[in-house]
Amino acid sequence: MALCNGDSKPENAGGDLKDGCHHYEGAVVILDAGAQYGKVIDRRVRELFVQSEIFPLETPAFAIKEQGFRAIIISGGPNSVYAEDAPWFDPAIFTIGKPVLGICYGMQMMNKVFGGTVHKKSVREDGVFNISMDNTCSLFRGLQKEEIVLLTHGDSVDKVADGFKVVARSGNIVAGIANESKKLYGVQFHPEVGLTENGKVILKNFLYDIAGCSGNFTVQNRELECIREIKEKVGTSKVLVLLSGGVDSTVCTALLNRALNQDQVIAVHIDNGFMRKRESQSVEEALKKLGIQVKVINAAHSFYNGTTTLPISDEDRTPRKRISKTLNMTTSPEEKRKIIGDTFVKIANEVIGEMSLKPEEVFLAQGTLRPDLIESASLVASGKAELIKTHHNDTELIRKLREEGKVIEPLKDFHKDEVRILGRELDLPEELVSRHPFPGPGLAIRVICAEEPYICKDFPETNNILKIVADFSASVKKPHTLLQRVKACTTEEDQEKLMEITSQHSLNAFLLPIKTVGVQGDCRSYSYVCGISSKDEPDWESLIFLARLIPRMCHNINRVVYIFGPPVKEPPTDVTPTFLTTGVLSTLRQADFEAHNILRESGYAGKISQMPVILTPLHFDRDPLQKQPSCQRSVVIRTFITSDFMTGVPATPGNEIPVEVVLKMVTEIKKIPGISRIMYDLTSKPPGTTEWE
């Protein structure tokens, strides 16, 4: 069989196969095609007591066979199988007699190798969907004929390869194929993530029933492994740990304290000016109770005026650099994160100097988690993952320190829920372990900074599509070319649901002139936000349905919000100039305080994984004839429920959170001077990330 996607085999193909000296009898190899969820597959397999190892997609088939792997799982990825830059792989992996499960991109690879075709279709699927399954197929044994799964793809199988049959469908789209005699299976959805309700059953069927794994691999004691790693790397040196007070950095510090002598650990909390109300004070008090002495540094001024070096442009491949604007004049989310991350390191170096320590003898410790590295496309996590957003603890400067071996990240293979379990094993108090996550850059990435509106050429047409969707029951009576596009992108079931919703409720749907970061098809997207308003009381189930449907039809939208209050008559087309100034931050800080205080008092904080409160530069309810300038801002409440922060869903008012709790938040936030409207984020992940930036 010929080599695929490349004229010759890459020089390093198979070179990362653990030096070729290991034997993995009974284990599963995960070939990494660059999916954001690659490490989640590894984790899910190990949860089922089967050993798994992650190797590059280009690993040759003979190496996999020689190493004794029992089965192969191919991850998803951001590429198209027909793209010129599609990653190379050895097609013989499908013919060495090993059971193969191809996920998303992996399924498309499998189909193409055996003569099938893959096309980029008009319908993009990003979110949770009901799909039909053939539950007589070994992979789906024990499941219902309809299951809820996560789909996130633009390319779809068109012609199914000879010898394969379709075993799952999402409407008219192929969602699963199988050649049972050869034990080759492909699924377009992601069984590894929590949003696929019975994904674990599918993986168990593959591992046990199809591949014949024994399930005798038990996970090592992670705490002891972390402590061993810290001792081995640090020796007698000092470690500077940057403490935010959140669960990640606190567990990291507790591990350092357990592994090293107390005088080796220097715990520093840097108040960057973007903390929540009274945050630094409460952090210091909480950690003192744990016996951890913390040096608190007020560095707000340094951060507000911080800069970093950046490439001349995104297209410039030369090493030439430019100095960024100061943080308080920067609007780019990526540049904000990079400035904040590099300023953290600069201040850490200043602390080292003030304490008369030798920089070459001091390590920097961080509570970096696996999702941080995956979303930053760090090689530590995945060789091919597409950049979603730069994390403040995985900037270019941090990566340089990491290459020099100067960064300690004992939690780099952990997900959030695993860190909480580890924290309990370390006897940390429950109130600290169960805290909602708060990003290191703090409120800085919860302010949507902008000088001008985000309006591209597709703005008017997209707005017209949204009008058709919001008034679908009336639109079907007036044939329009865009109506045909809407119908082409939706199933009959979707259209029936749209008819029902729009005939019962009076809705407006329109674009907001701002952009937020999302993840669509394993790639980063900076896209529009769709706003929905209504004169009726919100029907939350219907709104959640629309939030799933709209990004599927309009690929330039990655987030949908409901706007509280009367119908929006004139959607804003300009923005209030917004930067990271003290006044802007004070407004958001108060809104965040009010919302979280109400959530805590309601007793529902434990039901919600995280609740970012976002300040946007949008001023509603202005009469265009009076030409009133945009001077107010609006707040978004982003409830989020997840087990691993790789995928998740919003809390539906009336289900996971009482409607009256949400309305109380709206009432209290509206009292803050300068607030125009309150919005509720209806978006799952994907297509929207947890944070807006």
Swiss-Prot record:
Domain Glutamine amidotransferase type-1: 27-216
CC terms in the record's Gene Ontology section: cytosol
Biological processes annotated in GO: GMP biosynthetic process; GMP salvage; response to L-cysteine; response to xenobiotic stimulus
Location in the cell: Cytoplasm, Cytosol
Tissue occurrence: Expressed in the testis, brain, thymus and ovary.
Functional pH dependence: Optimum pH is 7.8-8.0.
InterPro entries: Class_I_gatase-like (IPR029062), GATASE (IPR017926), GMP_synth_C (IPR001674), GMP_synth_GATase (IPR004739), GMPS_ATP_PPase_dom (IPR025777), NAD/GMP_synthase (IPR022310), Rossmann-like_a/b/a_fold (IPR014729)
Positions bearing N6-acetyllysine: K9
Keyword ATP-binding tagged: yes
PTM annotation (N-acetylalanine): residues: A2
Binding site for XMP: R337, D522, Q610, K685, E691
Modified residues (Phosphoserine): S8, S332
Primary residence: cytoplasm
Residues that, per the record, bind ATP: S244, G245, G246, V247, D248, S249, T250
Record's keyword terms, sorted: Acetylation, ATP-binding, Cytoplasm, Glutamine amidotransferase, GMP biosynthesis, Ligase, Nucleotide-binding, Phosphoprotein, Purine biosynthesis
Record EC number: 6.3.5.2
This protein's pathway: Purine metabolism; GMP biosynthesis; GMP from XMP (L-Gln route): step 1/1
GO molecular function: ATP binding; enzyme binding; GMP synthase (glutamine-hydrolyzing) activity; GMP synthase activity
Protein origin, superkingdom: Eukaryota
Record-linked NCBIfam families: guaA_Nterm (TIGR00888), PRK00074.1 (NF000848)
Quaternary structure, from the entry: Homodimer.
Function recorded in the entry: Catalyzes the conversion of xanthine monophosphate (XMP) to GMP in the presence of glutamine and ATP through an adenyl-XMP intermediate.
Name assigned to this protein: GMP synthase [glutamine-hydrolyzing]
